[in-house]
Every structure is written in structure tokens, then in C-alpha cells.
Amino acid sequence: MRRERWDSLRLLTPNWQSRLPGYRYEGVDPDGFMTVNDVIEFVTRFAAVAGAPVRTHTPVTSVRQTDEGYQLATRSGEIRCRSVVLASGACNLPNVPAVSEAVPASIPCCTALGYRNPDQLPAGGVLIVGASATGVQLADEIHRSGRHVTLSVGEHVRLPRTYRDRDVLWWMDASGVWNQRYDQIDDLTRARRLPSPQLVGTPERTTLDINALSAAGVEIVGRLAAVRDGRALFSGGLRNQFALADLKMNRLLDTFDDWADSHVHDPDVGPPERFEPTRAPASSRLNLDLRSGEICSIIWASGFRPDYSWLDVPVVDRKGHLRHDGGVVDAPGLYALGLPVLRRRKSTFIHGAEDDARDLIDHLARYLAGGTFRQGAVDSGRATGRES
């Protein structure tokens, strides 16, 4: 589980945002970005500082309800408890589109979970499907290895790495955007399905977007719509996708500017700025012959999904998502943490866990104390409708 990402991966969030209850990053590079090994060390140290009774090498194979609460089966034995917090996250399995089944068997395919570095790929061109954080990072890395890369782009979230001389995630944090609560969001279901922003964590704080990749020589095509008779068919809506992503980015930058007008008095913060619109290719290919030898491998960077195959409690909807209201699951004594927009927009990030956990503790404590309250209501006066 610790090695299910590519070798060069770094967090999208700067080190100063890596904080958990009673523990935070205190190294010499607060504006840097943690590697996978850094994250492992950070979490391991937190567990030691917190004195948490962590059981390593103890995978849970099932959770089921009993009259007294819950029974967990693990490879190290059985655990019985009154309450369970599900913190397994939302990125357990690769989300591979159904069109993958029509790809010619002669073309090796892998997902972002299986990819480690360019050396594992066969020589020749690479098609990467998906242009969120994972897709753009892999496209950049593989292109730098000397291969021709074709990047298939669908809906995406464009962000600059820095804005007005500050990391863009500083703005998300300071302006309160990340603290927006789930019951204040108009379309919560859509917010929970948004792809990760096009960001990369590098010492140079590089902005990695479609324009940067195009300028480097990566070929940009539309969303992969189908594979028929050995040909990949791409949608022709690139300009619309780019215009929508640019519009949403500029609206967010407007939000930052409005907040800064009344809250920021630091001379080190630069003036408002706007970025060049995403450049659409003069003519992008609508189809690609996968049998021509031009594409020698495909990487599915099309997102992830949760895995609840081990959860023997009827709280998962037909799409595989947990039914919960702000982390209070549709079963007494069952809770969740670490899911997209669980209680705030920052819920999936390391520093988002503390506030969410604090909100749920009171509900959990009252449940264990035998208090009478409706499952699903964390705070009075707040929304209690369940959202999956």
C-alpha cells in the first residue's frame, strides 16, 4: 500500500500545510513538497507522538454489524467494537473507463497505480488518458524521457502553482475557500466528483498546465469517447473544455482578489494577474489508429474510486459511494473521514482531517455514551440531508 504511486510523486500541498492534531511539519523547507517517503515518515512520526495504538500489517478483510456494534475480521484476528471510523479514503482503485476493453490486446496498458517510471514502458509513443494532476504529471515526465506523448483531455481544473507571489493553495487556505462547509455548497454531488487540479509539486514551483505541455511538445487531443476497430476516437470539444476551465479558474482568482482587497496588507503579495487562455491546437486529431505502431502503450490516468468490497454493511450506493451526511454514515456508530468534501472542501487533504475529526467527535462520543439523537445530525441548525 505504501508504494502504490509512481517514483517521482510529490504532494500537491506545500510542506507548511502538512499538519495533524498536535503535530505539524517543522523542517527547513516549508515551501517544498513531500515525497512519498517523506509522507510515510511524517505519518509514522505522528503516530508515535500521538501514542496511537496502531496495528501495522493488519489489513481488515471485512466489517459487519452485530447486535453490540461491529465485528472486524483481520488477518491477525477478530476485533469487536461499538463504533468504527472508515478512513480508507476515496482513491483505492483505478477508475478505468469501459472503452479500455476495446483496446487491441497488442498494446500494453497500465494505470496510475501500476506506473512507476518511464523505464518500465516499451519504446515508442504513449497515450495518456486523463489530464488532471496525475495525467499532466505523467505526460510531462514521460515526454522528458524522450517519448512522444499524446494526452487525452476531458473535464479538468486549471490552477497556477503560484498567484500574486504566493502558492495558490495559500490563497485557498487564507481566503476561506477550503473551509467552505459541505452544507453551504449548492451542488454537493458535483463538488465531490471534481477532478484534482492540474498542479505539480516541484522545488521550482512550476505551473504545469495544458499550455506548458503543448509548448514542450506533448500532443493534445480530446476526451477518449470510444475505441472501434482498433481506432481511438476522441471528442471534438477541446475548445469548450478549455474555455470552461479558464472561466472557473478566473472566477476563483476573482474570489482571491476580492478577499485580498480587505484582508491583505503585505507588500510581498503581488498585484492581481491573469493568465493566458488555454491554447487549443489549430487542428487536433479526432481519431488515432492504435494498430499503426504510433502508440506503443496506454496509461489510464482517469481517476480513482473507493473500495468498499470489505464493508458488509448496506451503506454503499449503486455507484460504489458511501452514503453519509458529513461523515456520519447511514448506520449507527459508523463514521467516515478523508472523503472528498466530507465536511469541507479541504477534507481530502492532510490538514483537512483535524477539523473534520473534531466535528465528528462530539457525535461519536454521545453515541458511545448512549445519548438520544438522530443519526446524521452532527450540529443543530445544520443540514442533515444525506449525500453520497
Task: Name what the model sees in each region.
Residues 32-388:
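Flavin (primarily FAD) cofactor-binding/catalytic cores of flavoenzymes
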Residues 1-24, 28, 158-179:
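Conserved N-terminal glycine-rich FAD pyrophosphate-binding loop of Rossmann-like flavoproteins
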